[in-house]
Amino acid sequence: MNYTLNQHYEEKVRPSIDLIDSLRSLGVEKDLALPAIAVIGDQSSGKSSVLEALSGVALPRGSGIVTRCPLELKMKRKKEGEEWHGKISYQDREEEIEDPSDVENKIRKAQDEMAGVGVGISDDLISLEIGSPDVPDLTLIDLPGIARVAVKGQPENIGEQIKRLIRKFITKQETINLVVVPCNVDIATTEALKMAQEVDPDGERTLGILTKPDLVDKGTEETVVDIVHNEVIQLTKGYMIVKCRGQKEIMERVSLTEATEREKAFFKEHAHLSTLYDEGHATIPKLAEKLTLELVQHIEKSMPRLKEQIEEKLEETRTALEKCGTGPPEDPKERLYFLIDKVTLFTQDAINLSTGEELKSGDINVFSTLRTEFGKWKAYVDRSGKNFNKKIEKEVADYEKRYRGRELPGFINYKTFEVIVKDQIKQLEEPAVKKLKELSDAARKAFILLAQNSFTGFPILLKTAKTKIETIKQEKESTAESTLRTQFKMELIVYTQDSTYSSSLKKRKREEEELEEGELVKNNLGSWKGLPVVSVRSTVNGLDTHATLREMMLHLKSYYHIASQRLADQIPMVIRYLVLQEFASQLQREMLQTLQEKDNIEQLLKEDIDIGSKRAALQSKLKRLMKAHNYLVEF
C-alpha cells in the first residue's frame, strides 16, 4: 500500500502518535482523556473490513457481536524490506505474534479471557501493535458494533451495554469519531451516526466512512456522491468512501494487496463514483492518509491542554497522597519513632488549636467560633442590662409597698437593693451554663476533627484519641460548670471597690441628668400646643417617695453595670481556660502517656486496609503521571 504524505508530516507523524501510544500504555487514560480515533458502526456496516484493509491483517469476523472488547490497533510503518511484527497486550500480559495469520485467533482468545466465552462484552482494552512496510502510521480504537436485537445467549440489554461502552469513548472531546456506514442504507437512520451526533451535534470531530459502494441500488449513486460531498448530513471533517473485500473475495482468498488494486480500479472506472476518486475522497490508501493527518493535527491541537491536565492531576495526586500519609515503616525501631512523631505532631497541634496558632494538620480555627459566641454572650448581657433598667422602677415601687418597714421616707432600703440585684444576676446563670455547653461541644468537635486529620488511616489510634477527647470533654465541662456556678454564687455577694462604685454612680447620675435635660427641652418645644412645661427633676424631687425611688434606681443601674461587665468577661475566660487550654494540655499528657505502653504500639499502628490500597493506587498514579509529564517535556 503506497502512502503519499509529504516529508513535513512524515517527520511529525510517528513521534506524535508514539507519544500518545506511550501515554496510553502507561495507563494515563485512567486519569485523563487522550487524543484518539474511535471507530464505530452498526453491525455488518463493514467496520472490520475497513480495519483489515488498513492494518493488513485479518480480524475476527462473523455474525453477531464480533468485537467484544475495545481494540486499540497501533499501526507502525516500517521501512521497505523490514519484517512484519505483531504484539498483543491485555490484562498486564504481553505476547509477540510472529505470523499475521495468527492475529485473528489471538484476539479471539484475548476476548474470551476478558469478556468470557460466548457473546458478552468487556470495557477492558486489548492492544494490538502491528509493524509493517504496508501499514500507515496510525492508531485507532475499534469498538463493538451496535446491536439492535439480542440474539441467543446474549443479555436482553446487550444493545444498551454496547452503547454505554461506545459513549464512554466518543463523548470525550479528545476523540475523533470515525463512523462507518454502508452505502446501501439510509445514512440518517444508522445508530452509529445518531450516537455521534448526540455527543458531537456540530460534527466537528466526526468523520464519515461509506462502505460497500458495489451494493448501491442503481439510480441512487448520485445520492452517495452528495453524501461524500457533505451535502446531506454535514460533518466538518467530511466523508470518505472505500470498497473492501466482500465475503466472496475472502472465500476466494483474495489478498489485501490485490483487494486494494481492485478497489482502485472500481472507483476509477465507476460512472458516478470516479469523481470521488479524482477528488481524493475514495480508496483505503487515501483514507489512511486522511486519518493519519487528522490524528496528528488533533494531537498537536490537544497538546497544550494535555500538558495542563497532567500538571493539574499531578498536583491533585500529590495533595491526596499527602493526606494519606506515608504509612508506617517496617523496622520496629522506626515504627516507634513514626508513632512518636505522629502523636507529638497531634498534641502540638492540639496546643496550637487552643491558643489560636497555625496548625500543621489542616485548617481548623475554633477561635473564630469562640469569638462569635463570646460576642453573642456580651450582647445578651447588655440586652439584659437594658431590660433591667426599663423594669426596675416598677419593681422598686412594688417592693417598697410590700417590704418597707419603719424607715422614714427618703431613706434607701439596702435590703431592697440587694434582693433586686441578686435576682437579676441569678437570671444570667443558666444562659451562661448553656453557652459553656455549646462551646464545650464546639471544642470537642474541633479536637476530633484534628484527630481525624492527624491519624487518617489509623483507626485504632484515631479511636484512642477520640475516646480520650470525649472523656476529657466531660471532665472539663463539669469542672467549668462548677466554676461558673461558683462564680455566680460569689456574684450574689454584692461587692465592688468603693472607688469603682463611686465612679459608676457618678457616671450614671450624669447620664440621668443629661437625659432629663433632654426631656425638658423636648417638653418646652411642645408647650405651644398647650402642654404644661414641668421639670422632671422638680416633679421627682417634690415627692420624698419619688426621690427615694430615683436614688434606688441609680444605685441599681450603677451596680448592675459593674457586675454584668464582670460576668461578660469572666464567663468567656472560664470557658477558654478550662474547655480549651486545659482540655488541650490534658489531651497532650494522656496521648503522650500512650507511648509508654509499649505493648500497644503495634495495635495503634494498624493501618486501615482501604487507606493502604488508596495510597498504593495514588503512588501508582503519581508514577505514571510523572512519566507522562517527562514524555511531554522531552517531546
UniProtKB/Swiss-Prot annotation:
Residues 66-68 are annotated as: G2 motif. GO terms for biological process: defense response to virus; receptor internalization; response to type I interferon; synaptic vesicle budding from presynaptic endocytic zone membrane. CDD domains: DLP_1. It comes from Oncorhynchus mykiss. Residues 549-635 form the GED domain. GO terms for molecular function: GTP binding; GTPase activity; microtubule binding. Residues 211-214 are annotated as: G4 motif. This is Interferon-induced GTP-binding protein Mx2. Residues 41-48 are annotated as: G1 motif. The lineage of its organism: Eukaryota, Metazoa, Chordata, Craniata, Vertebrata. GO terms for cellular component: cytosol; microtubule; nucleus; plasma membrane; presynapse. Keywords: Cytoplasm, GTP-binding, Nucleotide-binding, Nucleus. Belongs to the TRAFAC class dynamin-like GTPase superfamily. Dynamin/Fzo/YdjA family. Signal peptide: none annotated. It is found in: Nucleus; Cytoplasm. GTP binds at residues 41-48, 142-146, 211-214. SUPFAM superfamilies: P-loop containing nucleoside triphosphate hydrolases (SSF52540). The gene is mx2.
